[in-house]
């Protein structure tokens, strides 16, 4: 092994397999970045964009296999290139870590893409329905009873939000949270007489790939109080890997917190002053 750091070793040729392993890893990174840009900016339809992405992951796997072959060759003939192999392995590990995590999530979570607080009467996609016309896009119609049952098992805490505020106030709080999240609002209708039903339709993007996921929110009166129902659905793919459930659960939490924080602090009633004790003169 000492020979590998000696002067004669430095004159040895670099393994071509090691060079190929490194170059494939670099190409995979470039292809992944290009595929993300294609999806985010809509340069191509979804299928070509995904083909680019999975092709990049395939290059990363091929880079690992070539790197292993290069390692065996270097061990046998003493050529150089270990640094290139290690660089390729590092790049590939970073590149494949998140897809590997998503693969595990795919096995753990139910294959559903449409989450709602009210499976019996989910908020409808009206303005958003026109945006679901691309090839491979999911239907704007709710996924149905199978999805509802899978949701009930996997995410039992996702339920209608009941608020002790009027519908107009619930609408304002919800719209402010949607705006704060930088979701693209497609349509908004505040509660109006006689039915006093408010609606918000918006589009969110997944953090890395920027896949579009559609959200419809309905605010309905409940006497002097209000109920908020939320629906979040992936525009593409049969499984959302839990992203819609996480979005709905977080929005529910933030709506409740915003309404609770806006309530005036209730002052504790002061106890009446006690009358001075009577003294009996003796």
Identify the residue ranges that each predicted region occupies.
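Core hydrophobic alpha-helical transmembrane segments of single-pass membrane proteins
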Residues: 62, 93-94, 127
């Amino acid at each position: 092994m000492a020979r590998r750091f000696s002067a004669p070793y430095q004159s040895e040729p670099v393994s071509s397999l090691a060079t190929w392993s490194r170059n494939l890893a670099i190409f995979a990174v470039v292809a992944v970045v290009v595929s993300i840009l294609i999806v985010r900016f809509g340069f191509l339809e979804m299928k070509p964009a995904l083909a680019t992405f999975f092709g990049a992951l395939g290059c990363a796997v091929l880079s690992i296999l070539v790197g292993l072959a290069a390692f065996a060759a270097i061990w046998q003939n003493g050529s150089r290139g270990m640094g290139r192999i290690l660089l390729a392995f590092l790049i590939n590990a970073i590149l494949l870590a998140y897809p590997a995590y998503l693969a595990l999530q795919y096995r753990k979570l139910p294959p559903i893409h449409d989450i709602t607080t009210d499976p019996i009467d989910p908020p409808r996609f009206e303005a958003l329905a026109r945006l679901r016309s691309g090839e491979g896009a999911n239907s704007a119609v709710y996924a149905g009873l199978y999805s509802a049952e899978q949701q009930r098992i996997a995410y039992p805490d996702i339920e209608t939000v009941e608020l002790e505020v009027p519908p107009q106030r619930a609408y304002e709080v919800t719209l402010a949270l949607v705006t704060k999240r930088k979701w693209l609002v497609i349509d908004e209708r505040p509660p109006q007489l006689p039915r006093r039903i408010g609606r918000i339709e918006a589009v969110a993007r997944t953090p890395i790939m920027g896949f579009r996921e559609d959200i419809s929110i309905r605010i309905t009166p409940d006497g002097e109080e209000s109920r908020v129902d939320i629906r979040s659905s992936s525009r593409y793919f049969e499984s959302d890997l839990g992203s819609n459930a996480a979005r709905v659960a977080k929005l529910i939490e933030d709506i409740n917190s915003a309404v609770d924080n806006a309530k005036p602090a209730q002052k504790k009633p002061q106890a009446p002053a006690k009358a001075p004790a009577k003294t009996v003169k003796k």
